[in-house]
Amino acid sequence: MAQKTLLIITDGIGYRKDSDHNAFFHAKKPTYDLMFKTLPYSLIDTHGLSVGLPEGQMGNSEVGHMCIGAGRVLYQDLVKISLSLQNDDLKNNPAFLNTIHKSPVVHLMGLMSDGGVHSHIEHFIALALECEKSHKKVCLHLITDGRDVAPKSALTYLKQMQNICNENIQIATISGRFYAMDRDKRFERIELAYHSLMGLNHTPLSPSEYIQSQYDKNITDEFITPACFKNYYGMQDDESFIFINFRNDRAREIVSALGQKEFSGFKRQAFKKLHIATMTPYDNTFPYPVLFPKESVQNTLAEVVSQHNLTQSHIAETEKYAHVTFFINGGVETPFKNENRVLIPSPKVTTYDLKPEMSAKEVTLAVLEQMKLGTDLIIVNFANGDMVGHTGNFEASVKAVEAVDACLGEILSLAKKLDYAMLLTSDHGNCEHMKDENQNPLTNHTAGSVYCFVLGDGVRSIKNGALNNIASSVLKLMGLKAPATMDEPLF
């Protein structure tokens, strides 16, 4: 088995048993009908833990293409950190241990919610308890959310934090994210949060009383005025500080204010030394230890093909061009050796339901040209099912599927003539579920499975799997050995 190969990604076309409001089901699709009758096919998972997202969370094009190209599950920060904490890995985490052991006092700061966008309260609690096990005095600096969660939910999360408080763990300060998590260089906001960290802005109220007093002034969680509580007198030289947010953009300014000598946003108390660590990499210029470093994605599908001096072409229209280049190549912007890229402009319409065929025909012509040139691997994305599905227009989504089907017919016909192998799948679903139970349009991705079809010498059946099984399957069709980092093929 060693064939030139097509990897076709039909973006947003998923599997759904129910035919109601299912644009894929209702489309006239002779090519798909032929593939169902003549090719082995299976179902592929594209959401939740199978692609490194939290359980039940819908997949997306960025994560999907990364997973396809890497050939393995790349856990997103929220999941990666949660799994590590569940496995009790903190006790062996060098950045964490080195930071907390430099001082008897450890300051933990971060967004206090389970929104999962910037942080998670479970991470906050786990770090605090691990610090306590090491006999540290722990000062909690709580940032209230109200944006990724309900605007007046802080008291619920505060209770969870209070449940771990004792003589060694205390709530030291509080601040709305509007202040402590600014990202627009509005340093007058950061300054207020910074002052509370320094032991200024004292309130005689308890944390719960203080939050309620803010509510009484019609101030919601996002905008809670920074304050510090009794028995907290500010950070001191030589103490340790960990910022627990895993998303970096809204963490940089407050960390810069605490640790960067060249910071000039406002006048600050000068520290000789604070032992700072961050949850993930926040900025390339930061010298601080990182508890969960960015994972380097190597030996991707494109890289392996390039290592064998084979040719490849990555083709998509504008809407999905980054996905078949940057994302499928593991976050690498520069093309690999012998990698050709073809960008087809997307049509200039307000919304794609006005032109559901989008630029699929032009994309197909580029694919056919590369096949005639004998390119060893052709990766192509058809954007229609996703981009038209996002409009919520059922009739247009049916036309989008029909347009893709016609293009697939041309490609499949030439593939058989030129002895190309083919693997066809989707990065996630969308257009197979267009209305909810109340008949309102559904415009989001679906959290379900997608089809996978294979045309290849000797391939009679394929297993169910997930997107992490695609790269090794493509390499097998090409007669190439998959690297040990990749998960098993589907056949």
Curated annotation (Swiss-Prot):
SUPFAM superfamilies in the record, alphabetically?
2,3-Bisphosphoglycerate-independent phosphoglycerate mutase, substrate-binding domain, Alkaline phosphatase-like
Q: In which pathway does it act?
A: Carbohydrate degradation; glycolysis; pyruvate from D-glyceraldehyde 3-phosphate: step 3/5
Matches recorded under InterPro entries: Alkaline_phosphatase_core_sf, BPG-indep_PGM_N, Metalloenzyme, PGAM_B_sf, Pgm_bpd_ind
Q: Which cofactors does this gene product need?
A: Mn(2+)
Keywords, ordered alphabetically = Glycolysis, Isomerase, Manganese, Metal-binding
Task: Name the residues that bind Mn(2+) 2.
Answer: D11, S61, D427, H428
What domain of life? Bacteria
Does the keyword section mention GTP-binding?
A: no
Task: Write out the catalysed reaction.
Answer: (2R)-2-phosphoglycerate = (2R)-3-phosphoglycerate
| Function, in words | Catalyzes the interconversion of 2-phosphoglycerate and 3-phosphoglycerate.
NCBIfam families the UniProt entry points to: pgm_bpd_ind
- List the protein's name: 2,3-bisphosphoglycerate-independent phosphoglycerate mutase
